Amino acid sequence: MPGGLLLGDEAPNFEANTTVGRIRFHDFLGDSWGILFSHPRDFTPVCTTELGRAAKLAPEFAKRNVKLIALSIDSVEDHLAWSKDTNAYNCEEPTEKLPFPIIDDKNRDLAILLGMLDPAEKDEKGMPVTARVVFVFGPDKKLKLSILYPATTGRNFDEILRVVISLQLTAEKRVATPVDWKDGDSVMVLPTIPEEEAKKLFPKGVFTKELPSGKKYLRYTPQP
């Protein structure tokens, strides 16, 4: 598991300096979902492509009541200067403003607290840098998803958006999403729901795939 947080743990209510000023994390989240994601260093190629894609997708996350906040071991001043490069990469006006804040963790306090450091990747002083961690928190401030990539492999933010849509759907409805599921695809009825109850819960219908075992656990229904 990435770092010091396990699924179901409450997010630490830390304070930090960011590109939009000082924040307290729980106040920043409010009643929203939240994604806290770390990157190794500013002014590096893979990180620029990642935050560029996150910026492009920010409106899609916002539509779903999801707040983004990034973190690295660089200073606020570096974050702001690098934001110009990131916007230029996106063929946008090279301003210091991204659609989400970036946390200044130059002392590595949060990276240590949250277990975000990559021991295999070090800076010019021989100190470990932050790995590519993703934490998704629900409106209850509890961890719903964690992903850990090494510094050398960029993340897929379209996949992170897909997962968030699944998390929100399955938090509200008694369904699960199958392999390669996309928003709008059929979903799976939880195996703990009796057949008669499933018919009432899912008026659009329930399709059961016949299997050699004779067990009726592969049940699909249109996305509620």
From Swiss-Prot:
A Pfam cross-reference name: AhpC-TSA
Enzyme Commission number(s): 1.11.1.27, 3.1.1.4, 2.3.1.23
Listed GO MF terms: 1-acylglycerophosphocholine O-acyltransferase activity; peroxiredoxin activity; phospholipase A2 activity
Record GO biological process: cell redox homeostasis; lipid catabolic process
Residues modified as Phosphothreonine: T44, T177
PTM characteristics: Irreversibly inactivated by overoxidation of Cys-47 to sulfinic acid (Cys-SO(2)H) and sulfonic acid (Cys-SO(3)H) forms upon oxidative stress.
Residues bearing PTM N6-acetyllysine: K63, K209
Compartments where found: Cytoplasm; Lysosome
Residues with PTM Phosphotyrosine: Y89
PTM-bearing positions, type N6-succinyllysine: K209
Keyword tags: Acetylation, Antioxidant, Cytoplasm, Hydrolase, Lipid degradation, Lipid metabolism, Lysosome, Multifunctional enzyme, Oxidoreductase, Peroxidase, Phosphoprotein, Redox-active center, Transferase
Chain segments carrying region Required and sufficient for targeting to lysosomes and lamellar bodies: 31-40
Record's catalysed reaction(s): a hydroperoxide + 2 glutathione = an alcohol + glutathione disulfide + H2O; a 1,2-diacyl-sn-glycero-3-phosphocholine + H2O = a 1-acyl-sn-glycero-3-phosphocholine + a fatty acid + H(+); a 1-acyl-sn-glycero-3-phosphocholine + an acyl-CoA = a 1,2-diacyl-sn-glycero-3-phosphocholine + CoA; 1-hexadecanoyl-sn-glycero-3-phosphocholine + hexadecanoyl-CoA = 1,2-dihexadecanoyl-sn-glycero-3-phosphocholine + CoA
Site (Important for phospholipase activity): S32
Record-annotated active site: C47 (cysteine sulfenic acid (-soh) intermediate), D140 (for phospholipase activity)
GO CC annotations, alphabetized: cytoplasm; cytosol; lysosome; mitochondrion
UniProt xrefs under PROSITE patterns: THIOREDOXIN_2 (PS51352)
Residue ranges of every copy of the Thioredoxin domain listed in the record: 5-169
Annotated transmembrane regions: none
Function as written in the Swiss-Prot or TrEMBL entry: Thiol-specific peroxidase that catalyzes the reduction of hydrogen peroxide and organic hydroperoxides to water and alcohols, respectively. Can reduce H(2)O(2) and short chain organic, fatty acid, and phospholipid hydroperoxides. Also has phospholipase activity, and can therefore either reduce the oxidized sn-2 fatty acyl group of phospholipids (peroxidase activity) or hydrolyze the sn-2 ester bond of phospholipids (phospholipase activity). These activities are dependent on binding to phospholipids at acidic pH and to oxidized phospholipds at cytosolic pH.
Family: Belongs to the peroxiredoxin family. Prx6 subfamily.
Binding partners and assembly: Homodimer. Interacts with GSTP1; mediates PRDX6 glutathionylation and regeneration. Interacts with APEX1. Interacts with STH. May interact with FAM168B. May interact with HTR2A.
Identification of the protein by name: Peroxiredoxin-6
